[in-house]
Amino acid sequence: MVADFVAHIGKKLPDDVVAKLEELGSQETAALPKALYETMTKNQKLAVELNRPSCQDTGVLQFWLKCGTNFPYINELEGLLKEAVVQATFAAPLRHNSVETFDEYNTKKNVGKGTPTVWWDIVPNSDKCEIYAYMAGGGCTLPGKAMVLMPGAGYEGITDFVLDQMTSYGLNACPPLLVGVGVGTSIETAALNSK
């Protein structure tokens, strides 16, 4: 079931994103932006009709788990997710993106050391588990940047940093652009908050 879900999200954008693209496209009057919205909408429709990923770079899978301590499969969950990624890679098919960096080879299964990435939120005395999946391709993560600002920079410093990144590096990102901004006490916390 999880493998089917992973394959599905590689082919279909969330309904709210599709609706927003159609809404923005209908409001656009300039020729080039209107053509871009039409292309994204057509691409999404074709991906669903042809049962193919909507992007060639389906990314490296990341999972966020909100899992109860009494969930019956808590001990097997990471292994099950890894196996689901392998199955989805061949069934969808998803592009083989997972590379063992220092060994310099592609696993061809989208799994490897630390891949897929799994973040845990453990809920005491619960037997429920929620799984959130995200495909982080190079086109969306390439322009990502983290920075430690001086405490006195305040909201203005954050705003300046975000706008500078969007105008400098956002040009290289794949549309539609969804900007995540995380503010935290460390770079690691801020990066996770931005997701």
Features from the language model and the residues they span:
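Non-transmembrane, aqueous-exposed alpha-helical and coiled segments at domain scale
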Residues: 1-195
